[in-house]
Amino acid sequence: MDTHIYDAIVVGGGLAGLTSGLLLAEKNQKVLVLEAEDQVGGRTSSWNDHGMHVESGFHRYIGYYSQLPKILRKADVELNEMLTWEEKIHVRVGQERPVVMGLAPLFGFVKMIKGLIGNHKYLSLKDKLSLIPFFVGGLLQYLFHPKKLDQIDVRSFAKKCGVTDRAFRYLIIPLSTGIYFLPPTEYSAYVFFGLFAPGVMKFYKLRLGAFNGGMTEVMCEPIARKIRELGGEVKTGVRVHQLQVQDGKVTGVETEAGDRYSCEKAAILATTLHNVKDLALPFKDEPFFANTIYKLPMMPASVIQIELDKPAIEIDITSFAPLTHLASLAEQSRTTFQESEGRLSIILTPPEKFLELDGKETLEIVLKDLDRVGIPIRDHVLDYRKIDHVDDFHSLRPGNQHLRPQQKTPIKSLYLAGDYTHQPYFATMEGAAASGIRAVDAYFKDHH
């Protein structure tokens, strides 16, 4: 049983953990990052699954991010090399051509204007105008009455604001279920507006970025590499079993293999909420933990990735298919999976339904829905993988956001990082990076 001594140990090699590790290593702290899986990245990872290159779920980088870009610059990652920018989205309804919505006011101004004044077949002037009180009222409540807004779901708030059924179907469902895969009747209005509120002052930067490769390869491994270059350590395939606690202080961690790693200053738990609940059991009766993480519910996600003999869609673009099981989808053979002839990645809704189904059953449902929205791929499927995340997300249903804990805990030398912790963002890459930054800020305030 080996013992290794560090200034700080970070449990979890996702974006929150890598952010924490990089900022600590940058300040000459002897830091160790431990990741349970065989690759870094956590919910933003990619790997080879028995011969098929897959990722944890299909992700998009939002152009108004500000915290994550700082970390990527420190890791020498060039944003425009990592991403292919999208200035519009597709909403697929039936067999007809997709509804095109421009979303980049600076980089795709003409496309955005066409989307706003066009699409009359689907959205009348009345439909579009009905969205104004919804967005204005929602953003104002987000700023001034957040707890009240977190008590109502998106569907109920839209009805209250007079959003028409067509506007709700073609715009609100894609922007809610399409992003966080919950039905609008179960989706907190506070979370919905919280996705957009941080970008209001940076609205001109709005656009989406598709990754030009697996997220481990193009984003997360470069951060891990920079940590190592700065003298830190990053170990994969190491699952932490429990915290070592002495006199109320966290002094290290023990792995499932029986190895012990000691920390002289602190441990940062940057793993999933589910894992944090297991690791923090020695402190479960402390009010800080009892009233936050042990009350904060979790929710699942389910994704299917389909390998094809040709592209399913003519361009790689973020698409939504409201009123189907396809929360959001994208062809990725020209961006993330360039070694593939065709690759369709789909986030499924409701995820609970698909956790109970095997891959074959899931594929059949998906193929039928794809036929409904004009993407017939049944004769072109080569392989597929269904990837489930049972408890990886904190619940975005109404009434839960006040339960998110601060990064600094009352336990000496223990900090939390993860997008479930309290910061301005939710289940996003930006939230993960922001939480890591806040955890390290708290660390240095205590160890200056």
Where in the sequence are the language-model features?
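Active-site/ligand-binding neighborhood in enzyme catalytic cores
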Residues: 133-243
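Mid-domain catalytic core of redox enzymes
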Residues: 3, 238-360, 364, 368-373
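Dinucleotide-binding Rossmann-like beta1-alpha1 core, especially the glycine-rich loop
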Residues: 50-135, 143-144
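Conserved Rossmann-like nucleotide-cofactor binding loop
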Residues: 16, 39, 274
